[in-house]
């Protein structure tokens, strides 16, 4: 299994390194890969019963993108300027903590991840 996520907001980017709308549109690229696998693209086959396995099963990971300081409808997620380093692209300490929390919450609650992620050991 490969859990695929979008990237975080990039509206604060100060250079040409993946500014918006590229960061938002990246999510469509992820979605399209998953749709290709669902449609049976042999280059993305994960099931040995259907031929040579060439890829892992692609599943959605946590959705990390939100539109800056506009709260996301599903969970009120926002990204403030303080969540990014000076370049406006890479997460600062607060942005890293926010991302890590979203990822950890995902693995603790997703039905496909929870059984193996929460194993004591």
Q: Residues of each region from the PLM?
A:
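Catalytic His-Asp segment of secreted/periplasmic serine-dependent ester chemistry enzymes
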Residues: 6-121
């Amino acid at each position: 299994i490969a859990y695929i996520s979008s990237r975080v907001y990039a509206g604060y980017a100060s250079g040409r390194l993946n500014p918006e709308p590229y960061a938002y549109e990246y999510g469509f690229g992820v979605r399209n890969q998953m749709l290709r696998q669902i449609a049976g693209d042999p280059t993305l086959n994960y099931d040995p019963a259907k031929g040579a396995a060439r890829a892992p099963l692609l599943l959605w990971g946590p959705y990390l993108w939100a539109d800056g300081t506009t709260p996301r409808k599903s969970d009120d997620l926002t990204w403030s300027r303080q969540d990014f380093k000076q370049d406006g692209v890479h997460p600062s300490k607060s942005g890293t903590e926010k991302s890590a929390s979203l990822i950890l919450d995902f693995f603790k609650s997703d039905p496909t991840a929870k059984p193996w992620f929460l194993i004591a050991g």
